Amino acid sequence: MAPKGKGGGKAGKGGDGGSSSEGKAQGPKGGGSAVKVRHILCEKHGRAMEAMEKLKSGQRFSEVAAQYSEDKARQGGDLGWMTRGSMVGPFQEAAFALPVSSMDKPVYTDPPVKTKFGYHIIMVEGRK
């Protein structure tokens, strides 16, 4: 039973040039089924850009989130562990594309991600 066409399953030959370490996500980004996410949510693009400027000037993500985020759960923007399928499309795509980073050296979405809720600046603190 050979697989039809190209692309296909996880066991395909040639692959993406990496050794297949099963279980854990490969490399610092992509893969995994859950991410530990922080975000800053602003309804207005201008406010999201103000928050972005604060981040770029070196202010801590959690402080900027507390000051700017309009999310009801204002715990420094911490959303905790989120699984695939539990987030709106553009947010999920961005979250799973980001590398894991820390508060000291955050890697976040620039420009902010637009969803039906507003504009999100997203950072990922963990992946599993």
Curated annotation (Swiss-Prot):
Region Disordered, annotated ranges: 1-36
InterPro entries: PIN4, PPIase_dom_sf, PPIase_PpiC
Biased composition (Gly residues): 1-20
UniProt record, GO biological process: rRNA processing
Location(s), subcellular: Nucleus, Nucleolus; Cytoplasm, Cytoskeleton, Spindle; Cytoplasm
Superkingdom of source: Eukaryota
Catalysed reactions, semicolon-separated: [protein]-peptidylproline (omega=180) = [protein]-peptidylproline (omega=0)
EC number per UniProt: 5.2.1.8
PROSITE patterns in the record: PPIC_PPIASE_2
Entry GO terms, CC: cytoplasm; nucleolus; spindle
Domain spans labelled PpiC: 32-126
GO molecular function: DNA binding; peptidyl-prolyl cis-trans isomerase activity
Main localization, broad class: nucleus
Role according to the record: May be involved as a ribosomal RNA processing factor in ribosome biogenesis. Binds to DNA.
Entry similarity comment: Belongs to the PpiC/parvulin rotamase family. PIN4 subfamily.
Name of the protein in question: Peptidyl-prolyl cis-trans isomerase NIMA-interacting 4
Species this chain originates from: Taeniopygia guttata (Zebra finch)
Phylogenetic classification of the source organism: Eukaryota, Metazoa, Chordata, Craniata, Vertebrata
